Amino acid sequence: MDDTIRRLKELTDASDNIVFFGGAGVSTESGIPDFRSVDGLYHQKFKYPPETMLSHTFYETHTEEFYDFYRAKMLALDAQPNAAHRKLAEWERQGKLKAVITQNIDGLHQKAGSQEVLELHGSVLRNHCTRCGKFYGVERIAESRGIPRCTCGGIIKPDVVLYEESLDEDVMARAIHYIRQADVLIIGGTSLVVYPAAGLIQYYRGHKLAVINKGGAGSSLGAAVTIDGPIGQVMAQL
């Protein structure tokens, strides 16, 4: 076992107040591409940039194209949790982990068994009619063609925070609470460039910050442990 992984294992073994803050890199080992990696969504060629196609304006003005892109690129219904998701769920069952705070919208943490999951950017698994509020599962979106419609005729919109939309204030407040109270804070699979989510790290008051990310990022945060590598492979050793 690598010395840095051994150090992280010592921190997590000794703690019963771990909080995990994760991004797209947590799900890449489940086959879901990271937006910003070399082979991620932002480096693929589309008619419009992905951040345009995933914006509230595009949803309003090019609704059918929005859903075509969303179905093709944002839904990964066959994806399964990897070792990182499973380890976090295991820690929660053991009473060690207090919360998972995620920027991901894929629902894999819940699929792995995690209960206290704060989804900063929403979830593809939840969808609501914009007219009557009726709930729909992700299958309704996946199986639809064109613009998905409710039985009342309204548009079914995913519970996903699009560009230009604001984050849920209640979810943000709960995330701040958990981070502020944390003994060990693990940041995994995120380049910390998406705000306001990335700004949550400033609320951590402890001295046991660990960063697991391909390409690093921990030194600038003053992390106690920085591990450059795939998070699933790392967490499988903890």
Q: What kind of feature is each model-predicted range?
A:
Residues 1-238:
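Conserved catalytic core of sirtuin-type NAD+-dependent deacylases
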